[in-house]
Structure formats: structure tokens, C-alpha cells
């Protein structure tokens, strides 16, 4: 854990039509955050989704009211707009974000957390080589 005092943590996901992945992604993020700090929140920015992403997120807010919330955009504002809303909504010391399509495991935040130290202000992670499942490769073409 960084420093001597636990930091607080915001995890957020911009999401657009991610009904197939967003529920499990949020639950995984909640589980991971709880192992790192008692002071955490998970936020999803629903960027005008036309599928049932919004309904799934509303149900998750009922199930996890203490640590989960959603920001709904009535119309799609694009990736940059969703990121801006996510950063605006985040209230904790540290902020972690990744996309709502579950391409990345929110559990990776634990590796970033380990890299923090009193003299480190910013940590960034990325995949050096991707190992996408077949459906991700097909969708990406």
C-alpha cells in the first residue's frame, strides 16, 4: 500500500452500449477496490447507450448504493465527453479508469497501486502485447 495512510480510490468506466460486459466489470471493480482501501467508489459514465446498459447500471446502484454510482448522459457525448464526466464525478485521492467493454481487467489496478510511493505522483499502465479473444479481434476489424 502506498505511504503510511491508505489512499482513497475512484474507479470509473466510460460506457457506450456495453450491456454485455458492464455488470461483471463493475462487480469485479468493487471487489478489487475493497481489497485496496476502505474508502473507494466505482463510477460508470453511461454515454447515451441505446441498449440496456442504463438499466443494468441502475440495478447495480440499488445493489451497491454505498460504493457505486452512475452518471447518465442523455445523448452520446463521445469518448472525451465521457472521460471528462468521469473525472468530474470522481471524488477520491486516486483515480483509475479503463473502458467499459472489459478489454482490461480492473484487477490491474492492484499492480498500479503497488507502484505508488510517497514520491510518485502519477502511475500509468498499458498492455505491451494484446491477447484478445477471437470475438474482440473480429469486432476490432
Task: Label the predicted regions.
Residues 1-31:
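N-proximal low-complexity "stem/linker" segments adjacent to membrane-targeting elements
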Residues 33-38, 61-67:
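Short helix-capping segments at alpha-helix termini
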Amino acid at each position: 500500500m502506498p505511504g503510511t495512510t491508505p489512499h482513497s480510490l475512484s474507479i470509473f468506466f466510460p460506457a457506450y452500449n456495453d450491456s454485455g460486459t458492464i455488470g461483471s466489470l463493475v462487480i469485479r471493480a468493487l471487489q478489487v477496490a475493497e481489497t485496496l482501501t476502505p474508502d473507494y467508489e466505482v463510477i460508470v459514465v453511461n454515454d447515451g447507450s441505446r441498449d440496456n446498459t442504463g438499466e443494468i447500471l441502475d440495478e447495480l446502484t440499488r445493489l451497491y448504493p454505498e460504493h457505486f454510482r452512475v452518471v447518465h448522459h442523455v445523448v452520446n457525448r463521445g469518448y472525451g465527453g465521457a472521460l471528462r464526466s468521469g473525472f468530474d464525478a470522481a471524488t477520491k485521492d486516486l483515480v483509475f479508469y479503463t473502458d467499459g467493454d472489459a478489454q482490461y481487467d480492473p484487477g490491474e489496478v492492484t499492480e498500479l497501486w503497488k507502484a505508488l510511493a510517497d514520491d510518485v505522483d502519477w502511475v500509468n499502465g498499458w498492455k505491451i502485447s494484446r491477447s484478445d479473444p477471437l470475438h474482440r479481434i473480429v469486432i476490432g476489424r
